[in-house]
């Protein structure tokens, strides 16, 4: 699909990956429709999009509310006459021991991260199926491939998003909608404000687990998928490597992932008060693309080597430590080198 003048709806566009994606499409001349709960942040993002050469429409919405998502689609079609691309990117998270997670908070994560994507998919596909073409992009996570502890609701939601994409692709194929594509993006840890905004009942500050990649990397992947759709793609060498290692020895990866979350995802130095984060009320401010985590890469090679050693033995560990891993198709996967 040609990007210039295409109509692109993006949920979660006020910050992080969603905002970076809006800017990437705008820079290529797309007409972007920005949605999230924070109108002021969306308006700031819209100004940035217009400065980069795109046209922007702001439609605030809580994706957990289907009527609001339907209104988002209606306003898009009313303004531009069609929907070419829909990016489901709005997401929230909850960190807590499973037994201590407030059930209302747990349910809210699933409402936003699962039902929000269902709402977006229904609204988008209604228009795309009628026109016979379009691209739906669902932003999932590395945790859909390698689940982690203390964020059960989030992990469940991202696994559901991956399954949603696979199920929709099969249905569209059976119905003969060859021009309508559903793509799932599974990023590794990304440098966004997501972790600062998360609900947290662990008593420990949540930090981004290295290696950390830029949100622009995810945005560029999404733009590429619109031009050349693929069913599922990972973003970041660590995500590709973990996917390969999980296929070799899922149990070993699971054990190492648990240790690394305890050591590198939840701070042992900085306590944190219990809070519901942005689950019910949007975070204050005009929104940021980056979260200030991009320096957390120095121990990446050592961590991957641990996973590789547990999953596949010495040869894989050496390859991981040196900065490369074989992919399932035999190609080499690069990895950020330690310093």
Range-by-range predicted roles:
Residues 61-71, 103:
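The beta1-alpha1 cofactor-binding region of Rossmann-like NAD(H)/NADP(H)-dependent oxidoreductases
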Residues 30-44:
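Conserved glycine-rich Rossmann-like NAD(P)H-binding loop of the short-chain dehydrogenase/reductase
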Residues 174-268:
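SDR active-site lid
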Residues 121, 157-160:
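Active-site helix of classical SDR
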Residues 7, 14-15:
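Conserved glycine-rich cofactor-binding loop
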Residues 97-98, 105-107:
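Substrate-binding pocket helix/loop in short-chain dehydrogenase/reductase
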Residues 298-324:
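Hydrophobic alpha-helical topogenic segments used for membrane insertion/localization
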């Amino acid at each position: 699909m040609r990007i210039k003048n295409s109509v692109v709806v993006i949920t979660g566009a006020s910050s992080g990956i969603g905002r970076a994606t809006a800017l990437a499409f705008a820079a290529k001349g797309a007409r972007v429709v920005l949605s999230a709960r924070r109108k002021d942040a969306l308006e700031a993002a819209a100004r940035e999009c217009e400065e980069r050469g795109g046209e922007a429409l702001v439609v605030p919405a809580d994706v957990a509310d289907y009527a609001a998502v339907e209104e988002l689609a209606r306003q898009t079609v009313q303004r531009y006459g069609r929907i070419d691309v829909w990016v489901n990117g709005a997401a929230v998270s909850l960190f807590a021991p499973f037994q201590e997670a407030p059930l209302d908070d747990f349910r809210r994560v699933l409402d936003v991260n699962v039902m929000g994507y269902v709402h977006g998919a229904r609204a988008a596909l209604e228009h795309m199926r009628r026109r016979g073409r379009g691209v739906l992009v669902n932003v999932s996570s590395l945790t859909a491939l390698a689940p982690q502890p203390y964020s059960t609701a989030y992990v469940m939601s991202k696994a559901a998003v991956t399954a949603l994409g696979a199920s929709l692709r099969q249905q569209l194929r059976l119905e003969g909608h060859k021009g309508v594509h559903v793509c799932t993006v599974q990023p590794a840890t990304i440098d966004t404000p997501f972790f600062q905004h998360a609900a947290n009942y662990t008593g420990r500050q949540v930090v981004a687990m290295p290696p950390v990649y830029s949100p622009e990397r995810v945005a560029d992947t999404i733009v590429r998928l619109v031009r050349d759709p693929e069913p599922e793609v990972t973003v970041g060498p660590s995500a590709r490597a973990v996917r390969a290692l999980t296929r070799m020895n899922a149990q070993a990866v699971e054990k190492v992932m648990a240790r690394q979350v305890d050591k590198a995802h939840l701070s042992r130095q900085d306590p944190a008060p219990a809070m519901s984060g942005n689950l019910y009320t949007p975070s204050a401010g005009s929104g940021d693309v980056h979260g200030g985590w991009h320096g957390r890469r120095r121990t990446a090679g050592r961590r991957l080597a641990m996973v590789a050693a547990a999953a596949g033995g010495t040869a894989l560990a050496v390859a991981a430590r040196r900065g490369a891993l074989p992919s399932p198709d035999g190609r080499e996967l690069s990895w950020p080198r330690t310093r």
